[in-house]
Regions:
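Interaction interfaces in information-processing and related assembly proteins
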Residues: 1-50
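… and, occasionally, acidic/histidine-rich disordered N-termini of signaling adaptors
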Residues: 85-262
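Cys/His-rich microdomains that often coordinate metals
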Residues: 63, 84
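Cysteine-rich micro-motifs
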Residues: 70-82
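Short, cysteine/histidine-rich loop/knuckle motifs that typically chelate Zn2+
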Residues: 57-59, 79
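C-terminal catalytic subdomain
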Residues: 183, 202, 254-263, 268-287
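Short Cys/His-rich "knuckle" micro-motifs
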Residues: 66-72, 87-89
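Short metal-coordination and nucleic-acid-contact micro-motifs, chiefly zinc-binding Cys/His arrays
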Residues: 49-53, 73
Length: 287
């Protein structure tokens, strides 16, 4: 079953959906499909009152949380979908994965002397991992780079990742200092995400001079790979969306030719081998 906060969010979504459907139905000539959708919403709200919302109508186990967040009218768990429903879900996941990959930057990215490379491999069809590289509008000057991870899994996480991508693409054009950009992004993200949803994120600006300014919202340390070893750059603020107010101080470093900055998500550091041993931060820094 979902938490009370999630149920409150889902109830709000259902009520808003009902009002929109009723308004559309009033302006139509008795559309049967709209009337059926209104009935489905009423059934879902009734199940909330009875305490059975979120339970599979076949086996009475919980419907997957990410599927309810994506569609509050879901009433069957994955194990009890009909063949047409399963095919429709597979088609939706395939489309979501295609959209998500289309948002990734070029694999080989070069800008003002900087070379960026990344590897993206979701654990399932879609994920909440986020990666972007944004050139300035005039094509010269600093490069904005971001790596993050949103809370949750599956389709719900991928939808949140898409929201994060669109938000930073829009805010990047404002020209704010990095710490102010992060604070504004936090307020926007907090206002649009549901309670309990958040994102960890490293955001940075790289200049042609080799200077790099970094701000981290609760994300795993960035690894500065230098000639003399590896330096960890820790988070400077809380995850985005956790609280609507917060500060995100930045730190500026200077990379010399041949040095690099390694950013990653927990899919790397928490990977386990056949003996169920976690890879861990220490081994990652020793690569």
């Amino acid at each position: 079953m979902e938490t009370s906060i999630e149920n409150q969010y889902l109830r709000t979504q259902l009520v808003e959906r009902k009002h929109k459907l009723e308004a559309a139905l009033a302006g139509s000539t008795g559309d049967a499909s709209l009337a059926e959708l209104v009935q489905q919403v009423d059934v879902a709200l009734d199940r909330m009152e009875k305490g059975t919302y979120g339970l599979c109508e076949t086996c009475h186990d919980s419907v997957e949380q990410e599927r309810l967040l994506a569609n509050p009218l879901e009433c069957y768990c994955l194990d009890h979908l009909t063949a047409p429903q399963r095919r429709a879900l597979e088609d939706d996941l395939t489309l979501a994965a295609r959209i998500q990959r289309s948002l990734l930057p070029p694999k080989e990215f070069v800008h003002a002397g900087w070379h960026a490379h990344y590897h993206y491999e979701p654990a399932s069809v879609v994920s909440g991992d986020y990666c972007d590289l944004i050139r300035p509008e005039n094509g010269a000057g600093d490069l904005l780079f971001l790596v993050g991870d949103v809370s949750g899994k599956g389709v719900a996480a991928s939808m949140l990742m898409t929201q994060l991508h669109a938000m930073f693409r829009s805010l990047a054009t404002v020209g704010l200092p990095l710490s102010e950009l992060m604070a504004l992004a936090n307020r926007v993200f907090c206002a649009s995400a549901m309670a309990g949803q958040y994102a960890t994120l490293v955001c940075g600006r790289a200049w042609p001079t080799g200077e790099v300014e970094i701000s981290s919202a609760g994300h795993l340390p960035a690894l500065w790979v230098r000639r003399g070893g590896v330096t960890s750059i820790e988070a400077t603020g809380l995850p985005l969306g956790m609280f609507c107010t917060g500060s995100y101080p930045s730190r500026t470093i200077r990379l010399e030719p041949g040095e690099s900055l390694f950013l990653f998500t927990d899919g790397v550091s928490e990977t386990r081998n056949a003996a169920d041993t976690e890879y861990g931060m220490k081994r990652l820094a020793e690569i």
